[in-house]
Amino acid sequence: MLYLPPYIGAFGEGGDTYVNGPSMENRGVEILLTYRNSLPSGFNYSITGNIATFKNKITELPDNVRSVYGGNGMLDDIIGRPRNSIYGYVADGIFKTQEEVDNSPQQAGKGLGRIRYKDLDGDGRITQDYDRTWIGVSDPDFTYGLNLQASYKNVDLALFFQGVHGGDVWDSWIEYSDFWNIQNVNNTNHLKGVFNAWSPQNPDSNIPALSTRNTNDEKRTSTYFLKDGSYLKLRTIELGYTFPESMVKKAMISRLRAYVSANNCLLYTSPSPRDYAASR
């Protein structure tokens, strides 16, 4: 793969030079099956399903692009992992009591109602070098689709379902639904989830306390923002009617079909009701 590294502005327009990036191994498979049948009554239908999966991993990583592809820049790098791996902190709930704050590892900005991060190396401090790890992969486990078609006499119906299973998605809506301190406070609307934020009167909440300051750096890449990207969507539904040839022939039309269709009709995701299809 090629990579375009940043360059000093004084170099001018000729400073943008592509360099060789990592080497990657890709493997995948797709299966598509179709079944068609016609009944004596004149009812015809077909069912087509497909499923696909792919895996990739970085096999070689030149030193000059090592810091671009995640890891801590030392021993922990992306080699042997998927290209779209996510590197960050492991969120461990929020501080709900002063005792939890006092007995936790050193963490700049910690306090009641703030996100707590795991001390992965056990040294009693939350640091960028030793307390980040590989926390997810945005690639789905597999994708699938289902196409249903049926017709009876002059009426036809078609439905197309499409879905994704697995894969971690960065839910940017959380920046507005759970926080007041990591977006523009004065000029940005926020979702009503902020009304359920932690407070001494609401001590069981898992949403960070409202604040106009971000001393705990809570916009950092962490598992707090990662959600399961699985979904199933009814992409298209179409109902049509083909006019009899005897009717349209008088108007010198060989074939006339009228139809109504709708797109993105139904969506199923779990546990969040948000549509993660646009986040991929």
List where the protein language model places each region.
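Transmembrane beta-barrel architecture of outer-membrane proteins
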Residues: E13-G15, E25-V29, I51-K57, D139-Y144, ...
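Repeated loop/turn-to-beta-strand initiation elements of outer-membrane beta-barrel proteins
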Residues: S41, N154-L159, S246-M247
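Conserved small/polar residues in nucleotide/adenosyl-binding loops
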Residues: Y268-D275
